[in-house]
């Protein structure tokens, strides 16, 4: 999936890297603290979360690239689609299974009735094509603008989804690739934190649902695929997980987030089941 992993920056290349590394020691306690505070502190009524919300902070030991932020988003989307049973296999396995069947896969397909095999293959191809289109346009979007927040909405509609998941990137100050940590190493840290939080184990098995992606970007970024939603408000129900990424201390970048608006993917893509 990713190119061979580059070396993580030395402490000489990244100021205060030693300070960042110490922050990892408090990672587990931060998860517990945020989960506790989410049920105690009053929240804005328009974005109130239910008591079972899972808040997962992930602290990276240094800066990350804008390309890395995009990959975090894409991999989280794939992960949620599989964990919430919208895809029968993880995305990469599914793509390999249907586009270049292994001998075992070919043998399984032979055992199924021809009509069933054709329908299943057609549904899979459509689901993969729709998801790949969204992933591709997310890459273009991240190349145009900083993206402080992303929402992944399942079921219902964009205003009232059955479930929604948030990725908060607003505390990151993206750097160029050669100044940043290895994206592969950051992905391992991200998903380790999600697995430790056990965010999906208590959720009931859902039906197949439509999925919509919302992302914040600069109002003048020139985006022409994602549709601007000037008055969009984050849903008040259905929240399941927020992953907050940071580099261990407030971002040095001073960004006028009031100039950033929500954009909505113009497609609602649906997974499939065999």
Curated annotation (Swiss-Prot):
Modified residues annotated as Phosphoserine in this record: 102
Region (Interaction with MAD2L1): 45-78
Subcellular compartments: Nucleus; Cytoplasm, Cytoskeleton, Spindle
Coiled-coil regions, chain positions: none
Name of the protein in question: MAD2L1-binding protein
Cellular component, GO, one term: nucleus
Main location: nucleus
Database matches in InterPro entries: MAD1/Cdc20-bound-Mad2-bd (IPR009511), MAD2L1BP_domain_sf (IPR053729)
Organism in which the protein naturally occurs: Homo sapiens (Human)
Function: May function to silence the spindle checkpoint and allow mitosis to proceed through anaphase by binding MAD2L1 after it has become dissociated from the MAD2L1-CDC20 complex.
GO BP annotations listed: deactivation of mitotic spindle assembly checkpoint; regulation of exit from mitosis
Record family assignment: Belongs to the MAD2L1BP family.
Pfam families for the chain: p31comet
């Amino acid at each position: 999936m990713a190119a061979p992993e580059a070396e993580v920056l030395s402490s000489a290349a990244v100021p205060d890297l030693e300070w960042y590394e110490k922050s990892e020691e408090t990672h587990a306690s931060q998860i517990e603290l945020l989960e506790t505070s989410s049920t105690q502190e009053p929240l804005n009524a328009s974005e109130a979360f239910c008591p079972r919300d899972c808040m997962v902070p992930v602290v990276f030991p240094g800066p990350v690239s804008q390309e890395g932020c995009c990959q975090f988003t894409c991999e989280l989307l794939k992960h949620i689609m599989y964990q919430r049973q919208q895809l029968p296999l993880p995305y990469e396995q599914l793509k390999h299974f249907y586009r270049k069947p292994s001998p075992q896969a070919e043998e399984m397909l032979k055992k199924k009735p021809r009509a069933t095999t054709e329908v299943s293959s057609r549904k899979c191809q459509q689901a993969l094509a729709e998801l790949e289109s969204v992933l591709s346009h997310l890459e273009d979007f991240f190349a145009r603008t900083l993206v402080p927040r992303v929402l992944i909405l399942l079921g219902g509609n964009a205003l009232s989804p059955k479930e929604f998941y948030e990725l908060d990137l607003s505390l990151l100050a993206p750097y160029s690739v050669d100044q940043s940590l290895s994206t592969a190493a950051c992905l391992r840290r991200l998903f380790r934190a999600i697995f430790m939080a056990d965010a999906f184990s208590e959720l009931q098995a859902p039906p197949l649902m439509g999925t919509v992606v919302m992302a914040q970007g600069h109002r003048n970024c020139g985006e022409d695929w994602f549709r601007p939603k000037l008055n969009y408000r984050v849903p008040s129900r259905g929240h399941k997980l927020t992953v907050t990424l940071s580099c261990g201390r407030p971002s040095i970048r001073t960004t006028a987030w009031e100039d950033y608006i929500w954009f909505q993917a113009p497609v609602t893509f649906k997974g499939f089941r065999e």
